[in-house]
């Protein structure tokens, strides 16, 4: 896959107002190359949505942000939520990350985007096109990386509420505490929405109009809690640990006599996530970091009506997804004009699904490297490669070559990158 892009960058005069504009136009990004650099200096085609843009637009959820600000993304509502598409490809070929770590947990094959809390977002970086050389499986249509803020004030408490039609209500609470070397961030969010129909009528097989209970958008209630701690042991060594809990219950209409549609049960989703890591800064341009993240995502049916062996109020287990990922990554500035990245990654996916008689886990072991160099103050080049070994699908080599040439205030970019998708455990 190849692409060429050009862009113009404004240069502001000195002054407070101009500085604000410059920051908005040229933020620091990390998704395109795996290293922090200014947006105008990265050879990768990255789009950025800043926290200020999200705030000005009154955006409270991930779908709103993507729909309003990223033309290459679209969402199609269905019975189980929203179906994401990017560059014409389904969400199975889009990798969604939070601070560089994969978001897991799906509803009928669609990533459950409602578990993404927008209250802490610093910026959202969208990388168009294949990026498997850095991120591995699924990064074919593109990568969406949600970067969150870290606590800065000694004590900060914020709350926000939102109410719109269809009884859609959102309440968020955030508490930051930063004291010397230790910082804490706590967030809680509650969401609720009624279900709704375009019409209460449908056409049956005889072309007659009949009443229906089927909804275009299903009602739900959701709780999302997260906690993060950071500790700066020295100027060079830092640690972090985080965890979260996610709960969501649909609110679907029960079956009624004389009407089509309706359901015997609601669907309950519950997830736990945890992570920890450390970073050691060798110097201003070199560092080594170790990260681990785990996730346990479960779905169940909660019956409203008697069906088979189940009575109202009974739960039926349907699926559990577990995810473990450990990554060791080094970033090195061997010369003043180059940056080199090396990394190894171990990932374990586990699926328990009784209806398909699946109770299995598969691992993926990966190694990758990338070298970026700037020449003659106008040309930047990147060469990278990644090798993934999937327990069932075997090995896969993924290359990447990118270049950027500066012509005054214009950048011309060219990229060749490959992408692949390893089969899921259920596949």
Where do the language-model regions lie?
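Outer-membrane beta-barrel channels and translocator barrels
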Residues: 179-182, 234-238, 283-285, 333-337, ...
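Short acidic/polar hinge/loop motifs at secondary-structure boundaries
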Residues: 101-128, 227
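N-terminal periplasmic accessory domains that precede
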Residues: 62-65, 82-85, 97, 112-117, ...
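Extracytoplasmic beta-strand/coil segments of soluble accessory domains associated
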Residues: 63-101, 122
């Amino acid at each position: 896959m190849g692409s060429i892009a050009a862009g113009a960058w404004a240069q502001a005069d000195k002054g407070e107002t101009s500085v604000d504009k410059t920051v908005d136009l040229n933020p620091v990004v990390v998704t395109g190359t795996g290293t922090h650099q200014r947006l105008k200096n990265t050879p990768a085609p990255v789009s950025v949505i800043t926290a200020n843009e999200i705030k000005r637009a009154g955006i409270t959820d991930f779908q709103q942000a993507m729909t309003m600000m990223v033309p290459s993304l679209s969402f199609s509502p269905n019975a189980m939520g929203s179906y994401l598409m990017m560059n014409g490809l389904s969400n199975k070929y889009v990798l969604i990350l939070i601070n560089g770590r994969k978001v897991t947990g799906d509803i009928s094959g669609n990533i459950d985007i409602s578990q993404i809390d927008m209250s802490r977002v610093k910026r959202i970086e969208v990388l168009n096109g294949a990026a498997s050389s850095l991120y591995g499986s699924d990064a074919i249509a593109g990568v969406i990386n949600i970067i969150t803020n870290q606590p800065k004030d000694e004590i900060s408490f914020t709350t926000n509420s939102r109410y719109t039609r269809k009884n859609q209500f959102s309440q968020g609470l955030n508490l930051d505490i930063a004291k010397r070397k230790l910082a804490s961030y706590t967030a809680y969010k509650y969401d609720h929405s009624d279900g709704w129909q375009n019409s209460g009528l449908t056409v049956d097989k005889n072309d007659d109009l009949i009443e229906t209970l089927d909804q275009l958008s299903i009602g739900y209630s959701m709780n999302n809690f997260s906690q993060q701690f950071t500790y700066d042991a020295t100027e060079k060594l830092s640690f972090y640990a985080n965890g979260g809990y996610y709960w969501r219950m649909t609110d679907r209409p029960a079956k009624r006599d004389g009407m089509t549609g309706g359901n015997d049960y609601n669907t309950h989703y519950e997830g736990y996530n945890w992570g920890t890591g450390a970073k050691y800064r060798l110097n201003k341009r070199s560092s080594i970091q170790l990260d681990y993240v785990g996730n346990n995502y479960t779905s169940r049916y909660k019956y409203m009506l008697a069906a088979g062996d189940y009575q109202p109020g009974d739960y039926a287990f349907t699926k559990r997804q577990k995810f473990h990922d450990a990554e060791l990554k080094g970033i090195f500035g061997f010369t003043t004009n180059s940056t080199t990245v090396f990394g190894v990654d171990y990932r374990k996916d586990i699926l328990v699904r009784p209806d398909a008689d699946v109770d299995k886990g598969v691992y993926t072991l990966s190694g990758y490297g990338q070298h970026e160099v700037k020449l003659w103050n106008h040309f930047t080049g990147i060469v990278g490669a990644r090798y993934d070994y999937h327990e069932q699908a075997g090995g896969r080599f993924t290359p990447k070559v990118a270049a950027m040439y500066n012509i005054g205030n214009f950048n011309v970019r060219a990229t060749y990158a490959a992408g692949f998708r390893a089969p899921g455990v259920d596949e």
